[in-house]
Amino acid sequence: EKYYAQGARVAKWRTALKVDVANNCPSDLAIEVAAQDLARYARICQEAGLVPIVEPEIMIDGVHDIQTSVKVQEQVLTTVYKKIQENGVMLEGSLLKPAMVVPGVDAADKSDPTEIAQLTVRTLERCVPGAMPGVTFLSGGISEEDASIYLNEINKVPRKTQTRLTFSYSRALQSSCIKTWKGEAGNVDAAQKQLLARAQANGEASKGEYVPGSQPSDEESLFVKNYVY
């Protein structure tokens, strides 16, 4: 209520889950606790008039393949929405911020954008209620260009629901801008152009209209092992 009074209208809560098959991670208990925390936070937000962004992040650290990512993501999202229902959260007044379905960063077999898009959409349709107004993907350490390409391919996949699929990137939106700026006043104009270019790219990708390579980007991986805020 204090934050609402100060002008806030949206809040975000992130839980991070690492995939490590050999050590049974994430465990059923870890998923249950994370889902309950997210659902309770969402209910508290709505009671205060805030729109909750629910962020159950499946981190890309690891050697797991994309099918393992699918399995974990389906379990996590199914559990999250079970807890959201139990806590009386209004679906239409909330947003989901998940990771795209990708293999671990050190996986032996990589996946192309089409496979990533198809499995991501299938996972969402299996696990996320159609009443959800929007899904705002996190980038999770993939490069700026890949984040745009994957989102673009996702929005080309035929879907059964009208849930908006868009972006809520940090590193994949800001990296080239920050590298260009370097904290120096003389670089502000160039840095702003970099930021606008990535915003334009992701805006087009949200409509399935992005042409890969049409906007300047930092194509380096933004992955940071054990990344924390």
PLM feature segments, named:
Residues E1-L17, N24:
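Long, hydrophobic/aromatic-enriched structural stretches that serve as scaffold segments
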